[in-house]
Amino acid sequence: MKKQGDSDSISGIEGGMGCYPFSIIHFNIAGLPMGGIFGVASKSDVSLDLFFGVDYHSHLGTRRGGLAVLNEYGTFERSIHNISNSPFRTKFDSDINDMHGHLGIGCISDYEAQPLLVHSHLGSFAITTVGIVTNKDELVQDILDASKTHFLEMSGGEINQTELIVALINQKNTIADGIKNVQEKIKGSITLMVMTKDGIYGARDKLGRTPLVIGQKEEGFCLSFESHAYINLGYKDYKELGPGEIVFVTPEKVEQIQKPGDKMKICTFLWIYYGYPTACYEGVNVEQMRYNCGAYLARRDAENNIKPDCVAGVPDSGTAHAVGYANESGVPFSRPFIKYTPTWPRSFMPTNQNQRNLIAHMKLIPVQQLIKDKSILLIDDSIVRGTQLRETTDFLYESGAKEVHVRPACPPIMFGCKYLNFSRSKSEMDLIARRVVRQFEGDDVSPEVLAKYCDPDTPEYAKMLEEIRKQLHFTTLRFHRLDDMLDSTGLDHCMLCTYCWNGQE
């Protein structure tokens, strides 16, 4: 087994899970948010394609990265590193010279250390997942009640989510049936890859909330969360898996194990915030969607008498929305502050809120000549707590801005995500929109009353909007309308998940 370098402490533990004994190398990490996965099945060595393919998912997490390959001796090698203080490439540069084979998978994981290596009645395999299981406690208890087994407890008392997925797979007699069992039993969202000694299983979330695409070149195939991750590696688009679709990939072919389902609910936030500008989901490019989104905002503003001197976006994801607004409105696009990109990652990644706020402030450097005495229309991808955007607004005022008009690129976030956990908020009351609703309505708010605050044509919504504006010190505030935002994708609205904005499943 390959040494783990400066990764988190590891202990190999023999034990049982589900109805079957197996051994698993376990990591003492907790947490279940976003991440990215990549796999390669090739007639030639996969090491470089795997290295760069996983690295192209670094925008989806800043905590841990992991690689696993099936080596020439038919055994699995793995390396996992903490990447919170240095980029993926610098941590894995030396490892990749020693990890060779024709099959490999890897991930960027924003807490949970992956891939896991497993030995069970199904044989040896490696697994990596993206998503969140909201009925984890129930499933764990069901498995414990059904058999004399155990789960390895991580620090903080959490059960490793991917270990639970392994337990569900091991309840069946084949890996393919085990993956189907996962899709049937979990609530939430899971997209995964399972690497055996014969090939790689890829399975998209049952409702397609997260993507999984396949690229092809002469030597073989790759599987990827992000469609842009394989472009520079010489792969061409082969197919995008549909919701719930399962495939088995070898260097020679892609075999469909389960056809896609009819119902799609892909996360709209992939376009608004998560996705890298070069990525495409369901054939819709992220950058283009953000241009469309900004254009819709501009058309709504044309009905009012707002005449800013310039349009600016909060880097990075707000920038393309602002370009779209500027192109549509004719108001000049400007960069009144610049993100210092060499060292600062996305600010929502640290677990400490004060640290996130500090990073959000430190990474933006003002351009005084573009701010002083200007009326600025500022677009951010969203408002979650509101803390960082308020501080950014105050920062603009302190730098001499005359007015700051704010246009978030999505509606007010009213519900915590049950499927991807894009925010580290522990309670819906962390969301500024919900705090304001509680301020007006008290703690016990019925769904009917809450629905009024989600409707931009109601007095309740207007009252909430004005209160948020005052609390965050904006000159004016106008959120994106849900229909306009969905229209920006060009997809049927029924294909898009809108739970965090209107609570609809």
Where are these regions (language model features)?
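N-terminal amphipathic/basic-hydrophobic helices that include classical n-h-c signal peptides
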Residues: 1-32
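Conserved short alpha-helical segments that host acidic/polar catalytic motifs at enzyme active sites
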Residues: 19, 26-242, 248-309, 314, ...
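Flexible loop/turn segments at secondary-structure boundaries
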Residues: 45-47, 135, 201, 209-210, ...
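PRPP-dependent phosphoribosyltransferase catalytic core
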Residues: 198-199, 234-240, 393-505
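Hydrophobic, well-ordered secondary-structure elements that form the walls
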Residues: 297, 325, 382, 404
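Secondary-structure transition/capping motifs at alpha-helix termini
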Residues: 302-308, 327-334, 368-372, 394-403
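Short, glycine/charge-rich flexible loops or terminal/linker lids adjacent to PRPP-binding catalytic cores
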Residues: 327-375, 414-426
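Phosphate/diphosphate-binding loops
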Residues: 366-369, 374-394, 435-442
